């Protein structure tokens, strides 16, 4: 780049080797101190982070200087002359085909904004950093964009008025360009595939998490657990049903096998039964004669009654028998017992005797032996002899005879065995009577 492109107020020229632009604004104050301001527009940081940090630092320094110092503005006329002198050679070199990057850069509006000197309170001059306002200078931002599109250029060291060399820095991108790119990328985000992505959606990173795989494994595990629990519940239900059936069957068998033994109720719980009336049995048929209804005791009593007066009568003759026991031929009772007893058979109805009254003779008369009849005759003879002494004896004899006849009549209808027994008794009685007489 030609030295005419850069013009200072004091007439010093500095030209970088690579065509980069370095501006030096030197202003002389009253105290004679010189402040040198160098702004390297083409040499910026290599990466975006350094450019952003540098711009932030310059803004902070400007604020601090404004608060603690007084800023004095230089006349715009001097700066405008230098800028006009710079524009003419730039247009000439654009037609010649040289590097366009350093030519198109203008500092017209920067000159308007400020080449300022900071004067301290003690009168010393502090170096003032020239800052750019991107909001005011739209044209400058557009030109910077054109410079970045053409390529990267390394700035050569520039010589200042004092003979110092400034080392230019390699520039990759400007801070404004990076900020604009960031805003464009934030406004219109695109995925790796080039498709527009929704605002708020997560970007598609190159790696994948294992959460999905773990979720699938969890689902499979829970499904298996549910199947196991269902199988266990079914087994438990089946076992309970079987146990109920077995219990019911056992209960039925027990009910069939059980035999309850009831104890009898005690008697005091029961009401006493009413007393039963004993009914006498009436015989179905009447007896043939009133003699059949008589008892043996009654017949025995009659016989005893008949014998008692006889004994009383015989007691009168006991004295005579005691005086002459052999005269009357009394036999001992032992001999009478030793004599054999004759048993008579019952007679047939044709053999029965008939009494003079027209009644049949009793069967007892046939049973009595023939010896009894002479004894009766003897009794009658004795009665006649006794009549001489007393009449009542005859009457008693007749009573005895009639009683014997009644006894014989009463035993007519008795069974043959009873007849035999009574016949034996009558024989003994007759023998006893005979012995007494």
From Swiss-Prot:
Q: Which domain of life is it from?
A: Eukaryota
Give tissue specificity per the record. Answer: Expressed in seedlings.
Keyword Phosphoprotein attached: yes
Q: Where does this protein reside within or beyond the cell? A: Cytoplasm, Cytoskeleton
Which spans does this entry mark as compositional bias, Low complexity?
Answer: 41-55, 360-371
Question: Which terms in the Gene Ontology molecular function aspect does this entry carry?
Answer: microtubule binding
Alphabetized InterPro entries for the sequence: TPX2_C (IPR027329), WDL5/6 (IPR044833)
Q: Which UniProt keywords apply?
A: Cytoplasm, Cytoskeleton, Microtubule, Phosphoprotein
Per UniProt, the ranges with Basic and acidic residues bias are: 58-86, 151-167, 408-437
Q: Name one GO cellular component term.
A: cytoplasm
Query: Among the record's GO biological process terms, what is one?
Result: microtubule bundle formation
| PANTHER family with a match to the protein in the record | PROTEIN WVD2-LIKE 4, PROTEIN WVD2-LIKE 5-RELATED
- What is the name of the protein in this document? Protein WVD2-like 5
């Amino acid at each position: 780049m030609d030295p005419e492109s850069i013009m200072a107020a004091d007439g010093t020229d500095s030209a970088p080797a690579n065509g980069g632009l370095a501006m030096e604004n030197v202003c002389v104050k009253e105290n004679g101190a010189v402040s040198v301001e160098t702004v390297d527009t083409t040499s910026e940081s290599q990466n975006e982070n350094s450019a952003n940090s540098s711009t932030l630092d310059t803004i902070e320094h400007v604020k601090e200087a404004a608060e603690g110092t007084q800023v004095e503005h230089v006349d715009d006329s001097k700066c405008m002359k230098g800028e006009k002198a710079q524009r003419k050679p730039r247009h000439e070199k654009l037609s010649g085909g040289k590097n366009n990057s350093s030519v198109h850069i203008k500092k017209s509006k920067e000159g308007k904004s400020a080449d300022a000197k900071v004067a301290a309170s003690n009168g010393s001059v502090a170096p003032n950093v020239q800052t750019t306002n991107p909001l005011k200078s739209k044209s400058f931002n557009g030109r910077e964009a054109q410079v970045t599109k053409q390529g990267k250029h390394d700035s050569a060291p520039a010589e200042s008025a004092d003979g110092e060399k400034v080392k230019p820095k390699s520039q990759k991108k400007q801070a404004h360009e990076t900020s604009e790119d960031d805003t464009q990328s934030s406004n219109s985000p695109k995925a790796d595939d080039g498709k527009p992505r929704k605002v708020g959606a997560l970007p598609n990173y190159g790696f994948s998490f294992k959460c999905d795989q773990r979720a699938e494994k969890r689902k499979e595990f829970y499904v298996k657990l549910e199947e196991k629990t269902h199988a266990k519940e079914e087994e438990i239900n089946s076992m309970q049903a079987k146990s109920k059936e077995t219990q019911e069957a056992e209960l039925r068998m027990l009910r069939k096998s059980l035999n309850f033994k009831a104890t009898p109720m005690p008697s005091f719980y029961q009401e006493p039964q009413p007393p039963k009336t004993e009914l006498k049995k009436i015989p179905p048929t009447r007896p043939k004669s009133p003699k059949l209804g008589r008892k043996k005791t009654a017949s025995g009593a009659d016989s005893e009654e008949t014998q008692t007066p006889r004994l009383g009568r015989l007691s009168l003759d006991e004295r005579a028998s005691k005086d002459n026991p052999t005269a009357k031929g009394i036999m001992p009772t032992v001999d009478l017992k030793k004599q054999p007893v004759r048993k008579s058979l019952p007679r047939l109805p044709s053999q029965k005797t008939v009494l003079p009254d027209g009644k049949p003779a009793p069967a007892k008369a046939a049973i009595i032996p023939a010896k009894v009849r002479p004894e009766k005759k003897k009794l009658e003879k004795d009665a006649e002899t006794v009549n001489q002494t007393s009449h009542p004896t005859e009457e008693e004899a007749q009573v005895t005879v009639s009683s014997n006849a009644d006894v014989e009549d009463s035993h007519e209808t008795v069974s043959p065995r009873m007849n035999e027994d009574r016949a034996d008794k009558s024989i003994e009685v007759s023998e006893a009577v005979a012995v007494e007489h």
